[in-house]
């Protein structure tokens, strides 16, 4: 996302400018991120909702999730980045880190798991919650990988349930 942000903001400096964009206008900026057609539609709906709301980004999860295309993860990201709320960016990567360290989740779908949400909130609710979120996501990508995690390089493996089970069988 960082690699297209500046070009995107230069091309579409306001919600109004974005409402006038066609999928063809958005394609070169969104294609490198994948799923550009889906994202183009979502961006268009969000831009129209923002213009209709006077340009203010909603500050509540309920208001944000009323916009078609904005779900739990995106609303949490907006609340965290735009409004400074201490929200966890709970995706499959963060869920993997939390599950491995603390223990298995209680529900199949991470979006509906109160245990996982409580853990995520506990971990990221700090004065520097944005940095904590990014650190966990980076950690998931670099150390606590989905396949072949680098447990020996993990700074917290001594207390990690996944590590203990993998290395002791308990």
Stretches with model-predicted labels:
Residues 1-169:
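Catalytic cores of DNA base-excision repair glycosylases
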């Amino acid at each position: 996302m960082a690699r297209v942000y500046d070009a995107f903001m230069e091309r579409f400096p306001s919600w109004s400018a974005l409402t006038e964009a066609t999928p063809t206008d958005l394609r070169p900026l969104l294609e490198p991120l994948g799923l550009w057609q889906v994202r183009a539609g979502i961006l268009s709906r969000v831009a129209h909702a923002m213009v209709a709301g006077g340009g203010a980004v909603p500050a509540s999860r309920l208001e944000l999730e009323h916009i078609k295309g904005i779900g739990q993860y995106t609303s949490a990201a907006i609340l965290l980045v735009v409004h400074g709320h201490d929200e966890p960016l709970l995706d499959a990567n963060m869920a993997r880190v939390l599950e491995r360290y603390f223990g298995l989740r209680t529900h199949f779908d991470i979006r509906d798991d109160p245990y996982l949400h409580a853990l995520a909130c506990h971990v990221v609710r700090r004065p520097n919650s944005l940095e904590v979120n990014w650190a966990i996501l980076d950690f998931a990508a670099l150390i606590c990988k989905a396949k072949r995690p680098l447990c020996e390089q993990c700074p917290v493996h001594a207390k990690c349930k996944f590590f203990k089970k993998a290395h002791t069988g308990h």
